[in-house]
Amino acid sequence: MIEALERAAARPVSRETVQLLTEFVERLKSASATQNLVAASTLGTIWERHILDSAQLVRYEPHAGASWVDIGSGAGLPGIVIAALAKGPVTLVEPRRLRAEFLEETADALGLGDQVSIIRSKIENVQGKFDVITARAVAPLGRFLGMAHHLAHNETVWALPKGKNANSELAEARRSWQCEVRSEASCTDPGATVLVLTKVGAKSKR
């Protein structure tokens, strides 16, 4: 599993990190018995479907120690995985009480409490600026940019996993937003991509 994580994250991964993520997986499986944290159909492939899929995002951080915000973190995917692999502060935004409590308990249990912050709130109420903004399956791209743009500064990187509708979402978003974009192939799903956006700004209305 070390080799798979290193390929996904494009960086060395220690055995201690693998053990931490293994404990995270066990906590996810246990909690999913009472909460719908991840789809039951994906529990058998949780490493490939969720852990490695999240791990690949750290390769897009602009510099070591970058600050991350994971919007709609839910089960801690990708935020907890990013915190395990990266060195910078990670903020998890989750409005649902039970899931926010799961994130708080999990971060503390994994020894990530000093690195990870949980905000139980809707995205619109969150304040601050972050070096990297990420989210999995929260909203179509254009709407998500509108929801989260207040959290970006001029050099913020947006690292957003997308499925087969990535191109159509991007085309729709470009009606209202300007940005530089790279479409990177997912290392876990041949039908998926990671949209990496920079210099995101709203187009002026005419």
Language-model segments: residues:
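S-adenosylmethionine
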Residues: 79-81, 91-206
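Class I SAM-dependent transferase core
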Residues: 1-65, 69, 98-111
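Gly/Ala-rich phosphate-binding loop of Rossmann-like dinucleotide-binding domains
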Residues: 83-87
